[in-house]
Each structure stands twice: as C-alpha cells, then as structure tokens.
Amino acid sequence: MNNKYEQRSKNSYNKKAENYDETFDGKFTVKFKEILYKAVDIKNNDIVVDIACGNGRLLQMLTKKNSFYGYGVDISEKMIEQAKKLNPSMNFYIGGCEEIPFKDSEIDVMTVCAAFHHFPNPQKFAEEAARVIKNGGDIYIAEVYLPAILRIICNPFVRFSKAGDVKFYSPNEIISIFENNGFVKNDIEFSGKVQLIKMKRK
C-alpha cells in the first residue's frame, strides 16, 4: 500500500474497529446504513458486495431482506476481523477499492456506505465497479452531502485529515464519474447530510 490516504484510513479504522459502533464515526454512519437498507433491491441468491464494508454491519442488516451471497472488502484488517465475527457465513477481503477481487461481470449488487470521500482515485474505482458488476446490476452509493459553499470551504483542507478523507463530492460529480464508465443514473435521494445515488450498469 503506497497511497497516503489509504494508509491514513487503514490506521484510523484499525484503532476504532473493536468498538466501532460506539465511536463517533460508527454512530454517524447509522443513518447511511438505514437509508441503504431501505433502498437496496436484493433478489434471492444475488451476489452482494459492500465496498469499504467496515465491521460488516450493513451486510448483516441486508440479510433481513432476502437470501444472498454476501462479500465485503475493506482496507482495515481489524475491521475485517469484526466483519467476519458478525457475518460468519460471508466472505471478506482486505484491500482497497481500486482492485476488487472478483471476476468480470460477477456481481449483482454493490454498496458503498459513507466511504466514497475516502477513495484516492474514484475514477479507478468506477472502472473496477464497471468490470465486476453484471450488465443490469446496481451500485448504491450513500455518501456525505455538503452544499456547494461547504464543499468549497472544506475540500482544500479535508485532504489533510488523519482519517484519510480525500474530497467531498456533489451528486453530479459522482454521477458523471460513473456515467463515463458504463453506468446510467437510476435515482438520487437526499436526507439531511446523506445523498444516495443509485446507478445501473448498462
């Protein structure tokens, strides 16, 4: 791992992994998970992958919706340890978002919960998502939403965060990245500081 943002994220989340749900970040992301839970459409036996899965809480929640094959990817090995404990029947991988350990056109549903602003190269992530998601498959991104003026103020400084934050995005920026990589916009929802972007693989 040679990216400073990835290293910062890994160090930060390794420290808080054991009690993540009780930390500020853990509590902050509850609403993101709840919004994703309501929005995600999972069919029986779908292959579902949560990128930057953390302790696997979202995947655990999604098991209430349908029977699926669950996978998670996260850069923090300590978070992956917790995810395996929480979801013993699922498979988890330590890694970043730019090399997703799946074959071409293998995934039905992909989720990203409050993590997109940590990705060092979102273009590369979108390319990988396009590679591994089936035609007609879906990606759901629940991300921090800041009004334009706050993005202008925060973005020059957020990259110095010890937690590995890189940039806060507008919904149009996120959509454009994925439209340039073979996705079409399905829907956008806003709820307070959460933007939920749903895209479909063409």
Please place each PLM-identified region on the residue numbering:
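Conserved class I S-adenosyl-L-methionine
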Residues: M1-D41, R57-M61, M79-Q82, C154-F157, ...
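Short glycine-centered segments of the SAM/dcSAM-binding site in methyltransferase folds
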Residues: I47, G136-D138
